[in-house]
Amino acid sequence: MRMLLRLLALTVLSLPMAAQAASNPRISSPDGTLSVEISVDNDGRPAYAVKRNGKPVIQPSRLGFIFIDAPKFERNFVIGEHKTRSVDDTWEQPWGERRVIRNHYNELRVTLGEKNALKRRFDVVFRVYDDGLGFRYELPDQPALREVRIGEELTEFDIADPATAWWIPAGEWNREEYLYHRTPVEQVGDSQTPITLRTDDGLHLSIHEAALVDYAGMNLTRVEGRRFRAMLTPGIGDGKVMRT
C-alpha cells in the first residue's frame, strides 16, 4: 500500500539561468508559465527547483526525511523511473463564489532510490497548475521500509529573490492569537503556515500544506538567508510520524 504523507502547496498569485542537466526530470504547467525540475547533487541529495517564465522562483531545495532508529535516508540517491500525465476535469465545491472548479494540471512522478545495499526508495509527485503547484511524498511498501518513525523532514523552500513576508510565529504559547508580522524575508523566525511573500518585482507566493491524513502539521523554520525548512509539529514519543 502506498502511503500519502503530505501535499505541500506553493501558490503563485501575481503576474509580474543557469544551464540544466538534460537528464533531470522536469514538468511545466499547461500554459508553460511554471516549471519544476528534480535533481540530485554530487552527494546524491535530491532537490527540486521552480521557475516562472524561465526565472527562478524557488532555487534548488532539498527533499526527503530524517528517520529515527533507522539508517540515514538523505543522500546517495539516484533518479529512477519518472512518469508524466495531464489532467483537465472539474470538481464541485459545496460553498464559495464559484460552484464548479476547473482542475487542470500536469503531473510528474519521480522515484528516488538509494545506491547503497538497502535500496530504499520514495516517490515525489508534483502537480503543476498555471498559477501554482503542489507536491507530496509517497513511501511504497518495500522490505527495508516496513515500519519507520519520521523525526523530521528535509523539505526546503529556498526563495530566489528578496521579498517581504507576512507571517505569524510558530511554537509559541498562544498559538493562533497573534497579529501578522510584516518583515523582510531574512528576518522571519519560526513561522506558521501559510506564509505569504511578495518579491521586490511584485510576484506573490504563499506556502501552505493540504491533504494532511495521519501526518504531522508543518511549520517553517528559516535556516539561513531566504531558505526555509519544514518543521513538523511534535507528537507523542520520539517520532513525529509513524508509518506502518
Q: What is the role of each PLM region?
A:
Residues 1-3:
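N-terminal secretory signal peptides that target proteins for export/translocation
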Residues 6-16:
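Bacterial N-terminal signal peptides
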Residues 19-23:
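Boundary at the C-terminal end of the N-terminal hydrophobic targeting segment
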Residues 24-244:
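N-terminal accessory beta-strand-rich subdomains and adjacent acidic, glycine-rich linkers
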